[in-house]
Structures are given as C-alpha cells and as structure tokens.
C-alpha cells in the first residue's frame, strides 16, 4: 500500500540535522513555538524530573470535539531522534493549519520526557559519530522496561515520566 501523497511530501520536507538536540535546545524549541503561535498553543510545565528539570508540554489546539493525541520524545534517553521528531511535528502543526485540519486532533507534545537521562547522553549528541565516542558518552538506565507497566517486581515506584503521561492522557 502506497503512502498518501500529502504524507510523502511531509516526509520529504524533513530536513537534515548536523547533530541531535539536547535538553536545552528542545526546551528552547518548544518555547519558541509557543511564543510564535500564541493563538493556537499553550506551554505548561506538567511535571518535574527526579533531578529538578521541567517537563514541558506544548498544547496545540484543534477544533472542539477533536480527540487529544499525546506525543513524547525520548522515552529512552539514548534515542534522541525522538526529541527532534516531536519538535518537528510541533513546528509543522503550528505552521500549517491545513495539516492540523487534516489530522483533526488536539496535540500535547512533550519533546523530552527524560531530561535527566538525555543530559547524561549529551556528550555524544554533537559527534563525532564514532563507536568509541558514543560508547564513552552513552547512558541508558539499567533494569527492565517499566515505563508503561508501572510498578514491577524490580521497582516499587512508577517512573516520574510514566506518571506525568498517564495524567496527561486523561
């Protein structure tokens, strides 16, 4: 099955990036969009990470009755493409009323759900993109995947990012 032409154009419009975005760049991007599109956006702090970083959520309005979509980047802090993807989607939705109308949602976008983990990966985000450099600056939390399962036999506390997303989905 072929992709719709409008979606192929959206994909083709994604630009190149010389490096991945860190916590500060993702936060700046959300703040810039909120300032540039105040008639359709709201930027709120929806929580705080374990180390005191703000968890920011950009809401992009839809039409009354539209369902709400939650998008969040970096559920795994060593996968920074998610932050750039969330930020790109937010920018496209803000800039293009036709795209908002086509997708018919109210959007809640958190560009970085794990700023503490991303900060620990910032050493490799700008390169050089070699295995050695990546390995020397790599961080990923140890343990099982518990983001959406909440408590498990390995943990007694649901991760902060999971609690924030669960609250936003309601």
Give the ranges of each region predicted by the language model.
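Short beta-strand element of the alpha/beta-hydrolase
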Residues: 67-76
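Short glycine- and acidic-rich boundary segments immediately preceding or forming the N-terminal edge
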Residues: 1-56
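Active-site/substrate-binding loop(s) of hydrolase catalytic cores
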Residues: 66-67, 80-84, 88-170
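Active-site-proximal beta-strand/loop segments in catalytic clefts of secreted hydrolases
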Residues: 46, 74, 111-114
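Short beta-strand-to-loop junctions in surface cap/lid or active-site-entrance loops
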Residues: 57-65
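Hydrophobic side chains in beta-strands
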Residues: 59-60, 71, 111
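Gly/Ser/Thr-rich loops at beta-strand to alpha-helix junctions
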Residues: 49-51, 77-80
């Amino acid at each position: 099955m072929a992709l719709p032409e409008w979606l192929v154009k959206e994909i083709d419009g994604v630009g190149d990036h010389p490096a991945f975005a860190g916590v500060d760049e993702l936060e700046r991007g959300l703040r810039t969009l909120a300032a540039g599109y105040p008639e359709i956006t709201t930027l709120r702090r929806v929580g705080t990470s374990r180390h005191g970083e703000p968890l920011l959520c950009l809401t992009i309005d839809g039409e009354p009755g539209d369902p709400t979509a939650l998008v969040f980047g970096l559920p795994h802090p060593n996968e920074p493409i998610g932050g750039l993807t969330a930020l790109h989607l937010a920018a496209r939705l803000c800039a293009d009323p036709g795209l908002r109308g086509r997708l018919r949602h109210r959007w809640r976008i958190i560009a970085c759900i794990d700023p503490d983990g991303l900060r620990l990966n910032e050493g490799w985000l700008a390169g050089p993109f070699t295995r050695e450099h990546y390995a020397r600056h790599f961080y990923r939390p140890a343990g099982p995947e518990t983001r959406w399962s909440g408590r498990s036999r390995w943990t007694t506390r649901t991760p902060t990012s999971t609690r924030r997303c669960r609250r936003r989905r309601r």
